[in-house]
Amino acid sequence: MDFKDYYKILGVEPTADDKAIKAAYRKLARKYHPDVSKERDAEDKFKEANEAYEVLGDAQKRAEFDEIRKYGGQHGRPFQAPPGWENRGGGGGFEGGDFSDFFSSIFGGRGGGNPFGGARQQQRSAGRRGQDVELELAVFLEETLSKESKQISFQVPQTNAMGQRTGFTTKTLNVKIPAGVTDGERIRLKGQGAPGSGGGANGDLFLTLRMAPHPLFDVEGHDLIITVPLAPWEAALGAKVAVPTLEGKINLTIRPDSQSGQRLRVPGKGLANKQGERGNLYAQLKVVMPTTSDESTRELWAKLSEKAAFNPRAQWSK
């Protein structure tokens, strides 16, 4: 198993703050998103960036990674977790997601470090009722529209008839993400926490949902915003552009003489509310200049500047 230095993967320093880490992740996610990138290894790099952000974007997992990084792990070199590392601490681990063996060896199946948030148990003083379990669960935008369940695994404490803790066991559930969920929303799964002792009732499972940042979409309420890059001639002459949505690409008509910053509304392609009604997708146009140009291209721009009676700063003279 090779060591993964998540700082190197995102291209940030170990001293980077949360804002810099998020910005680096979004840059890589946009670059290697399967709907955007044509590079052969784009999918692998996209998954690698997601994994790095799952760790560095969470304060608790980042602290654990920083600690294990001190053991001398070097990116891409063989590595083995220190003895006893996976048995440290109690609480809920998460098994699932498309993550590497390295990630699973460090964070899988134990509390305080898992792809979708730390976990903690709240001890109830009442009788022999089982403990409640609290987890943070990352939810991707696509999952809010999916009819499929999301599988989660976590650890729950085991007790004997006297209520004394004897160890931990892993519990796996299939959870349906409700329509219209928002970041920070807390849902309760009754009786899905730790088992009771001496005939006592099971504890409950509380999930705090955290909306994971998307590489393409920003969220405004139940609306989605996507930036659509356009070549200058596409904005001037009009075009048909394939635009990603959460459910696949659609063809968007760009009218002639479109402006950078203009928003086009696509009804019903946003997120769902509690009633299942969909918000809108707003395509925000952004005119992008070519990064390089040859002599013939510059000649065309020069001819255009001579013929086009256009002053973009005309309002300054008023």
From Swiss-Prot:
GO terms for biological process: chaperone cofactor-dependent protein refolding; protein refolding. SMART domains: DnaJ (SM00271). InterPro entries: DNA-bd_curved-DNA, DnaJ_C, DnaJ_domain, DnaJ_domain_CS, HSP40/DnaJ_pept-bd, J_dom_sf. It is found in: Cytoplasm, Nucleoid. Residues 111-130 are annotated as: Disordered. Pfam families: DnaJ (PF00226), DnaJ_C (PF01556). This is Curved DNA-binding protein. The gene is cbpA.
